[in-house]
Amino acid sequence: MQNPKDDVLYAPIEWQDHSEGYTDILYHKSLDGIAKITINRPEVRNAFRPQTVKEMIQAFADARFDEQIGVIVLTGQGEKAFCSGGDQKVRGDYGGYQDESGVHHLNVLDFQRDIRTCPKPVVAMVAGYAIGGGHVLHMICDLTIAADNAIFGQTGPKVGSFDGGWGASYMARIVGQKKAREIWFLCRQYDAKEALEMGLVNTVVPYAELEKETVRWCREMLRNSPIALRCLKAALNADCDGQAGLQELAGNATMLFYMTEEGQEGRNAFNEKRAPDFSKFKRNP
């Protein structure tokens, strides 16, 4: 319920359009630090093709490296679908989805890694179908805000496909091994309430309130320490992501150390051609 003392969280959001040059996505930013990437292929339930993923990767990189952006929202155009996975009409015979030149891609795996390793929180804003590869995309996002018309599930085994990476292992971490096997082996579909009960989504709201609620969650996170958020994201990912997860966590620790006087003493001593003096720093237990 809205707190009347905190109207800023519910203030209307003003999006600036940065979609020029894109054909398959829409890209917007707000002045208060939120970026929104929208899959814009409603005629195919926002299924992605190689061009779609290429554009998402480009926009995502822009949002990641924009120091004014603190949270990234991923969504689909319209109320009928978040994303229905890979566009089977362009799926080829040589291990991927064909682009216009005939080259086969599975570049959605690169986009999954981008979401996972981005130091900024990524929020899936889901209305309608989040199916197949679209279901995996929303799971990999840090948070999922779902409309009451959202439908979740995997279709891979029905169309000769599967995701044996995060789509399987991370799902099992969220819903448990038995439920994950049910979702994959039976290819059933689940409504928003069922998804909430399984822990697949964070909250469910009426469709008319979906963007408003998503923005509220984003603004709440923007009030918190960005370094704390990035370190927590890396820490929460590390147990699932193996050495890559540990690398991300360690990289954040290195970044923090570089900000300390102790870390800067070593750098300064090297540049000043003198021996470093670390004796002034406490050796805490």
Curated annotation (Swiss-Prot):
Catalytic activity field: 2-succinylbenzoyl-CoA + H(+) = 1,4-dihydroxy-2-naphthoyl-CoA + H2O
Cofactor (UniProt): hydrogencarbonate
Binding site for hydrogencarbonate: 154-156
SUPFAM superfamilies for the chain: ClpP/crotonase (SSF52096)
Keyword Lyase applies: yes
One Gene Ontology cellular component annotation held by this UniProt entry: cytosol
EC identifiers of the protein: 4.1.3.36
Pathway: Quinol/quinone metabolism; 1,4-dihydroxy-2-naphthoate biosynthesis; 1,4-dihydroxy-2-naphthoate from chorismate: step 6/7; Quinol/quinone metabolism; menaquinone biosynthesis
Molecular functions per Gene Ontology: 1,4-dihydroxy-2-naphthoyl-CoA synthase activity
InterPro entries, A to Z: ClpP/crotonase-like_dom_sf (IPR029045), DHNA-CoA_synthase_MenB (IPR010198), Enoyl-CoA_hyd/isom_CS (IPR018376), Enoyl-CoA_hydra/iso (IPR001753), Enoyl-CoA_hydra_C (IPR014748)
Residues under site feature: Important for catalysis: 97, 258
Sites where the protein binds substrate: 45, 84-88, 97, 129-133, 155, 161, 258, 273
Key words of the record: Lyase, Menaquinone biosynthesis
Keyword Transcription recorded: no
NCBIfam families associated with the record: menB, PRK07396.1
Family: Belongs to the enoyl-CoA hydratase/isomerase family. MenB subfamily.
Function according to Swiss-Prot or TrEMBL: Converts o-succinylbenzoyl-CoA (OSB-CoA) to 1,4-dihydroxy-2-naphthoyl-CoA (DHNA-CoA).
PANTHER family: 1,4-DIHYDROXY-2-NAPHTHOYL-COA SYNTHASE, PEROXISOMAL, NUCLEOSIDE-DIPHOSPHATE-SUGAR EPIMERASE
Name by which UniProt lists this protein: 1,4-dihydroxy-2-naphthoyl-CoA synthase
Organism: Pasteurella multocida (strain Pm70)
